[in-house]
Amino acid sequence: MKKTIVALAVAAVAATSANAATVYNQDGTKVDVNGSVRLILKKEKNERGDLVDNGSRVSFKASHDLGEGLSALAYAELRFSKNEKVEVKDAQNQQVVRKYEVERIGNDVHVKRLYAGFAYEGLGTLTFGNQLTIGDDVGVSDYTYFLGGINNLLSSGEKAINFKSAEFNGFTFGGAYVFSADADKQAPRDGRGFVVAGLYNRKMGDVGFALEAGYSQKYVTAAAKQEKEKAFMVGTELSYAGLALGVDYAQSKVTNVEGKKRALEVGLNYDINDKAKVYTDLIWAKEGPKGATTRDRSIILGAGYKLHKQVETFVEGGWGREKDANGVTTKDNKVGVGLRVHF
């Protein structure tokens, strides 16, 4: 490559395109830069109002044309904020009396995703590294900005190998294997596992239909032992013009641990026009063995509006109720106003 890294960085900063900026494109090599700043002003039950980072990022994508439909690719994504864990200790005996997390903004620039691999035209993409897996693609009912979602699959991995096929008449499939963080044979195998998924999306005129399903297994620590968590998720969506109805069901079970986790999410979204939308999500969930089950019920309402094709604003509220095995109900109410500026 004739350009230096410094030159690429300068070009990326200087780029003013509203879409992903191509900062280098020569001799079959292409480098794109894009990102977004995502902020939410929120209020939760029993907490003061707060302003938080909701995943602001800058990403760099490079591809090299190797000929015959084959290309090599690389991707890096930077994030800017991390929560800080705080412990409050008793002044006399120095014992921890309370733990909580502080949501910071711009306190920690770090690499969130980093992977490379190959893409073959008409076949698919195979990538290696810190990335989302195809399990993250499963789910159709979450139309929210930050409160919804019930995906229980192995959806990402720091050390992952992921394959995703090209689209064949609306059908896409794939799988991923995730290594544990530590290769030492004596170390815990937490997070190691695999996921497979199939996605079908088809549109005929104003009518759209989607059917998605996935299955995963991964190691977790339960009762001081390494056990396998088996999970599956299935969802379907039907849409007509600007109206869409989606339903997802997720279930997971840890080997040798009583009880299962089950969740059902129903979402309804209406695009008023190409700028405005309104939506609602309902979530039912339960967890634990028979006789000691915890049940959750949530309703989410929201609206989004695009001031520009690259500028999103939204307001979203959620009202949750959790009932434990003793019948005690705990309320969990949240509301947020958000802004996302893409570049």
Swiss-Prot record:
<keyword id="KW-1015">Disulfide bond</keyword>
<comment type="subunit">
    <text>Disulfide bond interactions within and between MOMP molecules and other components form high molecular-weight oligomers.</text>
</comment>
<dbReference type="GO" id="GO:0015288">
    <property type="term" value="F:porin activity"/>
</dbReference>
<keyword id="KW-0472">Membrane</keyword>
<keyword id="KW-0998">Cell outer membrane</keyword>
<comment type="function">
    <text>Structural rigidity of the outer membrane of elementary bodies and porin forming, permitting diffusion of solutes through the intracellular reticulate body membrane.</text>
</comment>
<dbReference type="GO" id="GO:0006811">
    <property type="term" value="P:monoatomic ion transport"/>
</dbReference>
<keyword id="KW-0813">Transport</keyword>
<dbReference type="InterPro" id="IPR002299">
    <property type="entry name" value="Porin_Neis"/>
</dbReference>
<dbReference type="GO" id="GO:0009279">
    <property type="term" value="C:cell outer membrane"/>
</dbReference>
<protein>
    <recommendedName>
        <fullName>Major outer membrane protein</fullName>
    </recommendedName>
</protein>
<keyword id="KW-0732">Signal</keyword>
<dbReference type="GO" id="GO:0046930">
    <property type="term" value="C:pore complex"/>
</dbReference>
<dbReference type="InterPro" id="IPR023614">
    <property type="entry name" value="Porin_dom_sf"/>
</dbReference>
<keyword id="KW-0406">Ion transport</keyword>
<feature type="signal peptide">
    <location>
        <begin position="1"/>
        <end position="20"/>
    </location>
</feature>
<keyword id="KW-0626">Porin</keyword>
<dbReference type="Pfam" id="PF13609">
    <property type="entry name" value="Porin_4"/>
</dbReference>
<keyword id="KW-0812">Transmembrane</keyword>
<dbReference type="InterPro" id="IPR050298">
    <property type="entry name" value="Gram-neg_bact_OMP"/>
</dbReference>
<dbReference type="InterPro" id="IPR033900">
    <property type="entry name" value="Gram_neg_porin_domain"/>
</dbReference>
<keyword id="KW-1134">Transmembrane beta strand</keyword>
